Amino acid sequence: MFFQNIMIYLFSLLLIPLIVYFLLIYIRLRYSNNSNNQIKTIGLTTLIINLILSMIIFILFDFSSKQFQLQLEEIYKISYFDLYLGIDGISIYFLLLTTMIMPISLVANWNSIDSKNVLSFVIIILLLETLLLAVFLVLDILLFYIFFESILPPLFLLIGLFGSSDKVRASFYLFLYTLLGSLFMLLSIITMSSIMGATAFDALSKANFSYITQLFLFYGIFISFAVKTPTIFLNTWLLKAHVESPLAGSVILAGIVWKLRWYGIFRLIIPLLPKASMDYTYIVYVIGVITIFYTSFSTLRTIAIKELIAYSSVSHAAVYLLSAFSNTIQGIEGAIALGLAHGFVSSGLFICVGGILYDRSSTRLITYYRGMAQLMPIFCILFLYITLGNCGSPLTLNFIGEFMSLYGIFERISVLGVLASTSIVFSAAYTIFMFNRIAFGGQFSSYFFNYVKDLSKREFILLISLVVPAVFFGIYPAVILDGLHYSVSGLIYN
């Protein structure tokens, strides 16, 4: 009976944080004094419970099937649709990534949130996890859009309340750019619903839209995802959002939120619009290659470390975008592996720069750093592992993801595959430069003093929890690739 009801775990992933929301309000009202540690502990415990639940779901999941599993149907009927939940061999990995990154984001800001705003911060984190998980769990395209856009208000508040000096402008940039871009996707969803009379993924996957209809739907959905990924000419909001965001915001943005757009490609474009996605791949590839070159050159010239990491993330996102449209098993599996690796590595880089180093120096300019290996040797060792992961070095999951992604791109359009492979050279150039300047570069800067401490226990746990999966899955990628094979095959050949 226990195993027959495991689909309840999916609903529990969404319900538990909402229950804790009211519990936290009660604690604040009942224990008004000295309850901040209790609030943070309860929030962290909730996130860890969700992580354990997602691991149980992963263990019980049947990877030999390409169908949605553990489906929980008709939880609640809402006027035009029912709430359907389910997972497949693709969404389960993003589910795990979300439940791993969210507790890390909370612990990353454990000591840096003003005592008056701890309750608001924890509630926003819990609400974000609920909405993020809902995007990966729902089996309805309209619900996908609703939860997809519902993430914007909590992110707006997270940056607007807890960000840096220009936080208000950054939060409005993020909100307005991404919201306006989503209008194109909403129009596409309304069109599909009016044609088919249904919004469930299963029903829409059986649709045979005309070529002209597919073309308009493709451009509508792709423009929305291109704004949110972001790609060239549509990335104005990116630097503001990352630079002004609190550490937790940067970790969530790069580690999870970007994956929603990539995941949407596998749900809305490739299976529902196969002809348009095949015929107009070259447009996506040209945009992706231009994005790689633009962001790589921008990264090479910046002196702000947080901007460097943000541009680096866009460059890797462009490789992911190209491989997602490769229409090959190797390319799509590589894209998903690269997305997971990017979640670990980009989160680690932001914690190293926006958290550990910034807490000790109050600056993010690379010109102030050198010789940190003399002061913080343990930090520099873990920082090195994360840096090598960002370069796509062997024995890291990034290497597996980038190699398979570039192979898929080359199989699809060889010339653009060769151009896309320059991302490896560029990423090595700016990432190794960043590490060399921070860790070595001679005697440590007079900007720092001899009493600068190495990693605390909290910081060490944060970094090691990101380094271990990135290295483990790089050495043994079969855990991911074997599980993806059936679902990716069904995505391409159905």
UniProtKB/Swiss-Prot annotation:
The chain crosses the membrane at residues 6-26, 41-61, 87-107, 118-138, 141-161, 172-192, 207-227, 246-266, 280-300, 302-322, 336-356, 375-395, 415-435, 460-480. GO terms for biological process: ATP synthesis coupled electron transport; electron transport coupled proton transport. InterPro entries: NADH_Q_OxRdtase_chainM/4, NADH_UbQ_OxRdtase, ND/Mrp_TM. Signal peptide: none annotated. Pfam families: Proton_antipo_M. Keywords: Electron transport, Membrane, Mitochondrion, NAD, Respiratory chain, Translocase, Transmembrane, Transmembrane helix, Transport, Ubiquinone. It is an enzyme of class 7 (translocase). It is found in: Mitochondrion membrane. Coiled coil: none annotated. It is a multi-pass membrane protein. One of its GO terms (cellular component) is mitochondrial membrane. It catalyses: a ubiquinone + NADH + 5 H(+)(in) = a ubiquinol + NAD(+) + 4 H(+)(out). Belongs to the complex I subunit 4 family. Core subunit of the mitochondrial membrane respiratory chain NADH dehydrogenase (Complex I) that is believed to belong to the minimal assembly required for catalysis. Complex I functions in the transfer of electrons from NADH to the respiratory chain. The immediate electron acceptor for the enzyme is believed to be ubiquinone. PANTHER family: NADH-UBIQUINONE OXIDOREDUCTASE CHAIN 4. This is NADH-ubiquinone oxidoreductase chain 4. It comes from Trichophyton rubrum.
